[in-house]
Amino acid sequence: MTHETEAVNLKYEWRSTRVRCLDDQGQRIGEIGWHMIDDDQTYVIERTWVDPNHRGTAIAAEMTKKLLDKITTENKKFIPLCSFTEHFLDKEPQYRKAAYYPHDEEEF
């Protein structure tokens, strides 16, 4: 498979703690999950999942971009616990301004 987004009509289903990516048949092919902290001002991004048959198609990157766009539009912050999200930030550093790293505030 290529690293381009598949030529399907992707739909996104937003819930309070996750966003699902659905194919044109309504089947779940990807999901990002999170929980909220700081009086719902900070998303803690925990996981990114893509169906094995759809990996390598940029679906994870598209979902991550949509979620981070939502977070920045809401003027909220996020903690990237998910390794995919952290890797995504290396390629799309403009989203780092909304990233929050609690350990940066601790004194050692």
Locations of the language-model features?
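Conserved acetyl-CoA-binding loop-helix of GNAT-fold acetyltransferases
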Residues: G56-D69
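A short, internal acetyl-CoA/4′-phosphopantetheine-binding micro-motif in the GNAT/acyltransferase core
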Residues: T48-R55
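Short, compact, well-ordered microdomains
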Residues: I79, F84-K91, Y95
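A conserved beta-strand-loop-helix scaffold within acyl/acetyltransferase catalytic domains
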Residues: Y12-V19, D24-T42
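Conserved N-terminal entry element of GNAT/NAT acetyltransferase domains
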Residues: T2-Y12
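Conserved catalytic-core motifs of GNAT/GCN5-like acyltransferases
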Residues: R96-F108
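Conserved GNAT acetyl-CoA-binding A-motif
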Residues: D69-S83
